[in-house]
């Protein structure tokens, strides 16, 4: 059973062939930078909610 787990981990480590992202960009493609900015903004907002003080409940509502 342990060999099966090791085998699955090795399969996950094998590099995969180029995906759809490797295709040429068209004029309709949205740059990934906007997605990364949105993700960073969301994570920052969630982090601020997590680190706010219980006495200052209003900081959690932003």
UniProtKB/Swiss-Prot annotation:
Which cellular components does GO assign to this protein? extracellular region
Q: Which UniProt keywords apply?
A: Cleavage on pair of basic residues, Disulfide bond, Secreted, Signal, Toxin
Q: Which InterPro entries match?
A: T-conotoxin
**Could you give a GO molecular-function term held by this entry?**
toxin activity
What does the entry state regarding organ or tissue expression?
Expressed by the venom duct.
Which residues are the signal sequence here? Answer: 1-22
Read off the domain note: The cysteine framework is V (CC-CC).
* Family that this chain belongs to: Belongs to the conotoxin T superfamily.
The protein here is known as: Conotoxin Lt5.5
Protein's organism: Conus litteratus (Lettered cone)
């Amino acid at each position: 059973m342990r060999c099966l787990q090791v085998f699955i981990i090795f399969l996950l480590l094998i590099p995969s062939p180029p995906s759809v992202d490797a295709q040429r960009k068209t004029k309709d493609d949205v740059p990934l930078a906007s997605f990364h900015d949105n993700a960073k903004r969301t994570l920052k907002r969630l982090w601020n909610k997590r680190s706010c003080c219980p006495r200052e409940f209003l900081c959690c509502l932003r």
